[in-house]
Amino acid sequence: MATYAIGDIQGCYEPLQCLLEKIDFDTAKDKLWLVGDLINRGPDSLATLRFLYSIRSSLEVVLGNHDLHLLAVYFGLRKQNKSDTLTPILEAPDAPELIHWLRQQKLMHHDATLGYALVHAGIPPIWSLDKALACAREVEDYLRGPDFKTFLAHMYGNQPSVWDDSLQGQERLRLITNYFTRMRFCSADGELELTTKENAAAAPPGFAPWFSFMQRKTRQDRILFGHWAALEGQVSTANVYALDTGCVWGGYLTAMCLETGALVQCACEA
């Protein structure tokens, strides 16, 4: 039995199959942890989502910004962007089933036995692991509940940009979502900078990669994340593992075995 964490797939079905063949994945005994952005921008989003749904009992999934965007588009709360490749999913006869499954997924997963946490973008330096899990549950409960469309309709936006425990309602949910699904750079007190998408060296004044702060409350916790392709999987911070290696941009799709730390990759075509 093995557990593999896989970076952003983004509808790249063939590299995913290549990777599963390389690791000799067995649904009967192995598990996959997926860092989110399962779909969008790649060539085979529908095939990817259908396949993942078919092996759902072997998966732990956290949602990425593209997955949440699909939900908003599907429910008519947002229009597709020019770079989106979501139409085949939206028009699929099994779309309601796939979308319902996606809506049940997490923003954060933690396995104390394996000793890893899984998120799409990151955890702000001001949150402990328990605080992050509690905040993730707030959004997950809303997304799974009867009023989920209200959340999706108010999800977009860059404000508020800094955490305050007194935040309430949709502003609170939006900031939690931005931390988990959009964050790259922030300040030591958790203020988000959502404009810069280049590598760590491009940090604007006063900001740094979320994982780089000495006083970060999760420094002793092992965190797997995706989202930040410009890092090319390179992080010089202990206990932090960047798994988005730019598959959809012609890079690689990466899997990491949680039991051994071994990396396996398949090359992708842009």
From Swiss-Prot:
| EC number(s) recorded for this UniProt protein | 3.6.1.41
- Show the GO MF annotations: bis(5'-nucleosyl)-tetraphosphatase (symmetrical) activity
Q: Which reaction does it catalyse?
A: P(1),P(4)-bis(5'-adenosyl) tetraphosphate + H2O = 2 ADP + 2 H(+)
Mind telling me which Pfam families this protein's record contains?
Answer: Metallophos (PF00149)
Per the record, the coiled-coil ranges are none
The cross-references to CDD domains, in alphabetical order and at most eight, read: MPP_ApaH
Q: Which domain of life is it from?
A: Bacteria
| Summary of the function given for this chain in its UniProt record | Hydrolyzes diadenosine 5',5'''-P1,P4-tetraphosphate to yield ADP.
Protein family according to the UniProt entry: Belongs to the Ap4A hydrolase family.
Tell me which HAMAP family the record gives. ApaH
Q: Which PANTHER family match?
A: CYTOCHROME C5, PTHR40942
Q: What is this protein called?
A: Bis(5'-nucleosyl)-tetraphosphatase, symmetrical
